[in-house]
From Swiss-Prot:
It comes from Rattus norvegicus (Rat). One of its GO terms (molecular function) is 1-acylglycerol-3-phosphate O-acyltransferase activity. This is Glycerol-3-phosphate acyltransferase 3. The chain crosses the membrane at residues 14-34, 137-157, 161-181. It catalyses: sn-glycerol 3-phosphate + an acyl-CoA = a 1-acyl-sn-glycero-3-phosphate + CoA; a 1-acyl-sn-glycero-3-phosphate + an acyl-CoA = a 1,2-diacyl-sn-glycero-3-phosphate + CoA; dodecanoyl-CoA + sn-glycerol 3-phosphate = 1-dodecanoyl-sn-glycerol 3-phosphate + CoA; sn-glycerol 3-phosphate + hexadecanoyl-CoA = 1-hexadecanoyl-sn-glycero-3-phosphate + CoA. CDD domains: LPLAT_LPCAT1-like. It is found in: Endoplasmic reticulum membrane. The gene is Gpat3. Its EC number is 2.3.1.15, 2.3.1.51. Residues 429-457 are annotated as: Disordered.
Length: 457
């Protein structure tokens, strides 16, 4: 009995501390300054670790930026410039060497598939999963790493799991209870309160530090919020500062339980992407939703898949065909404190969350941008590209014309043929001034992309 009493006392003390120091302040959007102190200590520690690594590295070794860590030393000049020597003379067998070189470079390291793996770090952040490129480890640095493991797994992980369990449980229970009320302004207010409070608690479970910029441009009711997509926690990041109606794929498991509870309290739209009827129904419901200026803004990720936060890939045009005002949002994570990217082909949702909860913290910047509308004579594809460009510039991300669906699908033959035509024009000397891809050559499907997608669980 004494052992049981001790466990009960320890558990009650733990929950009391968590509730009073973290849970209640986070529920009201307040901070006692604990996370700020933690981040200052963490920044100083990582700066010290970087200096130790630099001292231990050979003089000829220089820490490179992520952009320069590629396997291949590429010629950055335009392809047409490289082919200038081919023009004005007859074809020779050696002319194919240039294209063979480019083809081999694409096979070894293309600019697309590397966006579906974690971003390389400039310096080690004392996490075992990111020390592949860093081998100059001193005894002092090893001791600090061991202490970091103890802190992350013996203190932070139990704390974060506790907060996540409380946040998810309150979300399911709260939305289920609110869903029993008749439609009214009171129900809407309670629904927004439950969503906002629970999302804030869940963000605290990740030691989230979020910096919101340009809050005067926050998405308004009746509008559509579009953002670049890195992880499922993008939803939590945005929902901590405002409520949204979400569009997404139906899931099973824990995600499915959360979805079914949430839709009772708020008009979220869940659908089966494989069902054509569902896709048409979603488009219809979205148009009806934005027509009502009293409803929450819709949250959509037009890329349709998670990208590693170094670039923005093709936006599907479906989100830009339904009309309404688009509110672009750029999200940029700091990988030095933890990798927010979800590589769904390698990790299921539970494994991903455990990796996040055993990282140092999730630090990110969110930029709200001025609302954008479709201009006269502008089609949906052009509008989507314009919004994508604005997000890429604001977030400091690389803009790519490629479809994120290439993560799992093969390149279509029509696109290969288009590239062959472009190359042939360049060889004969009547090609375009540059090899910049025209967005019209890239297949751009029309279905809206969800906030919760059909990633592997």
């Amino acid at each position: 009995m004494e052992g049981t009493d001790l466990v009960v006392k320890l558990l009650s003390t733990w929950l009391t501390l968590v509730g009073s120091l973290i849970l209640l302040p986070s529920a009201f959007g307040l901070s006692l300054g604990i996370s700020e102190i933690y981040m200052k200590i963490l920044v100083k520690t990582l700066e010290w670790a970087t200096l130790r690594i630099e001292k231990g590295a050979p003089k000829e070794s220089v820490l490179k930026s992520p952009a320069s860590m590629g396997i291949i030393q590429r010629d950055e000049s335009p392809m047409e410039k490289g082919l200038s020597g081919l023009r004005g003379r007859d074809f020779e067998l050696s002319d194919v060497f240039y294209f063979s070189k480019k083809g081999l470079e694409a096979i070894v390291e293309d600019e697309v598939t590397q966006r579906f793996s974690s971003e390389e770090l400039v310096s080690w952040n004392l996490l075992t999963r990111t020390n592949v490129n860093f081998h100059y480890i001193s005894p002092k640095l090893t001791i600090v790493w061991v202490l970091g493991v103890l802190v992350r797994y013996c203190f932070l992980l139990p704390l974060r799991v506790t907060l996540a369990f409380i946040g998810i449980s309150l979300l399911i229970i709260g939305t289920t209870l609110v869903g029993q009320l008749p439609d009214s302004s009171l129900k809407n207010w309670l629904s927004e309160l439950v969503h906002l409070t629970c999302c804030r608690i869940c963000v605290r479970s990740l030691s989230g530090t979020i910096h919101y910029h340009n809050k005067q441009y926050r998405p308004q009711k009746g509008g559509i919020c579009v953002a670049n997509h890195t992880s499922p926690i993008d939803v939590l990041i945005l929902a901590t500062d405002g409520c949204y109606a979400m569009v997404g794929q139906v899931h099973g498991g824990l995600m499915g339980i959360i979805q079914r509870a949430m839709v009772k309290a708020c008009p979220h739209v869940w659908f089966e992407r494989s069902e054509i009827k569902d896709r048409h129904l979603v488009t219809k419901r979205l148009k009806e939703h934005i027509a009502d200026k009293k409803k929450l803004p819709i949250l959509i990720f037009p890329e349709g898949t998670c990208i590693n936060n170094t670039s923005v890939m093709m936006f599907k045009k479906g989100s830009f065909e339904i009309g309404g005002t688009i509110y672009p949002v750029a999200i940029k994570y700091n990988p030095q404190f933890g990798d927010a990217f979800w590589n769904s082909s390698k990790y299921n949702l539970v494994s991903y969350l455990l990796r996040i909860m055993t990282s140092w913290a999730i630090v990110c910047d969110v930029w709200y941008m001025p609302p954008m509308t479709r201009e006269e004579g502008e089609d949906a594809v052009q509008f989507a590209n314009r919004v994508k460009s604005a997000i890429a510039v604001q977030g400091g991300l690389t803009e790519l014309p490629w479809d994120g669906g290439l993560k799992r699908a093969k390149v279509k033959d029509t696109f290969k043929e288009e590239q062959q035509k472009t190359y042939s024009k360049m060889i004969v000397g009547n090609g375009s001034p540059s090899l910049a891809l025209d967005s019209s050559t890239v297949d751009n499907h029309g279905s809206p992309e969800p906030a919760f997608r059909s990633e592997s669980l």
